[in-house]
Every structure is written in structure tokens, then in C-alpha cells.
Amino acid sequence: MDALQTQTVNSTTAPQPNYIPGLIAVVGCDGTGKSTLTTDLVKSLQQHWQTERRYLGLLSGEDGDKIKRLPLVGVWLERRLAAKSSKTQSMKTKSPALWAAVIMYCFSLRRMANLRKVQRLAQSGVLVVSDRFPQAEISGFYYDGPGIGVERATGKISMFLAQRERRLYQQMAQYRPELIIRLGIDIETAISRKPDHDYAELQDKIGVMSKIGYNGTKILEIDSRAPYSEVLEQAQKAVSLVAIVSDRRSLT
């Protein structure tokens, strides 16, 4: 695996933070079914507890669909942005242009704001299921880490933004979920589910995502290659236990 693709962000020496009661995050490579699982979990859990789904990535599939629906240029623009985004996000490429670094930093600020909203929602007693979760261990938006990358940034302004962004992710890493569900997959299954994705990028992401520790958060590993009914059942049992232990708002 390319060394630049998996640069580790310096960790802090602060004491391990407490988790956020009632917050569950589902993570994994593309093709593992994160969006489907989080949606179905919320539908099931809403029968018993006040439950809401939140997206803590950068841009959701819904955002991409909105761009596609723009008159005349929608489909072309979405493909163009996706291609540019893929090239800029890769840690194997050179430092992003200054304008791109500014946009990436703004995305990270937005992610921090969304995470704080999720924290407040969970603190109100709502059971929150998050699709994806930020981490500060490995650089790269691919892995939900810092996107600019202090390892590749050049120029005073870009380096300044990269360092600020790294601190942002170190702060976000202090917001630990009560439970992380990590969906595992192999490259052949992933590419069969996402044939439009780059094989090498998927393979890299599978390897990297399996190593992230999420600052000591409790992680439940589930094999997403299993029948979906089994995957959903395992996740439901784990999240239901979290809801009970964290005393979420009951509807019964």
C-alpha cells in the first residue's frame, strides 16, 4: 500500500475522552451498505425510541442527486465534480491548489458543526444513528480524516489551513460515539456492488478503514457479506442495548 496514502496524523496525549451516550456510528468502505443499514435501523428503532439518522460524511448521495437534477448541466456537473473530488482527495497526489484547500477546509468546518449538532441531539435523549464518522488517525477524506494533509501541503497558506484542519479533526476525535459498527467487506464483493468505483481505491480503503481505532471507541465488527437480514439483526441487537443502557426516550 502506498505510504503517502496512509499517513497517520499525530495523536494527542490527552486523557481518553468520554463517549456521547446514545450516539451510534456506522462506518465501512463503499459497498458495505452503510446508508441502507442506517436507514433500516432507524425505521426499526423508531418503533421503540425517539431515533434519528444523521450523515457525518462530506457530501451525501442525496446532495449528488440534487446536483444531477439541475437543468441541462446537472449530470455533467455531478460527474465533473466527482472526478475533480477524487483526484484532489487522494493523498498520492500533490498538494491541492489553494482554492481547493480553502474549500476542503470549509467542508471540515461544516463537518465539525454537524458533529456538534449531533452531540446536542444525543444529549437531548434522542437515539442518533450516524452514517460515517470523522477520525484523526489517518489523513484523507476517503477515510473521513483531514483532507488537505499536512504531509503534502505546500505554501504558507495551504500549510496553515492543513494544520488548522488537523487540529479540527483532533477535536472531533474527542466526540466518541457510544458504539461504532464497522462493516467489513472484501474487494471482490465491494467492486461487484460498486462497479463504477476504482478497484485500487476500493482496495486501499478496505485496508485502511479496518485499522482505524476511532480513539478507543467500542467497535462492533460485522461482515457485510453475510445475508442482509443477519447484518440488520446483529446491528439491531447492539443498538437496542445502547438505547437501553443510555436511557433513550422511549415511545412505549
From Swiss-Prot:
Q: Does the keyword Protein biosynthesis apply?
A: no
Protein name, as recorded: Uncharacterized ATP-binding protein YghR
A cellular component annotation (GO) from this entry: cytosol
Transmembrane helix listed as a keyword:
no
Q: Tell me which residues bind ATP.
A: G28, C29, D30, G31, T32, G33, K34, S35
Q: InterPro entries under this entry?
A: P-loop_NTPase (IPR027417)
User: What family is this?
Assistant: To E.coli YghS and YghT.
Q: Which UniProt keywords apply?
A: ATP-binding, Nucleotide-binding
Q: Which BP terms from GO are recorded?
A: dTDP biosynthetic process; dTTP biosynthetic process; dUDP biosynthetic process
Single Gene Ontology MF annotation = dTMP kinase activity
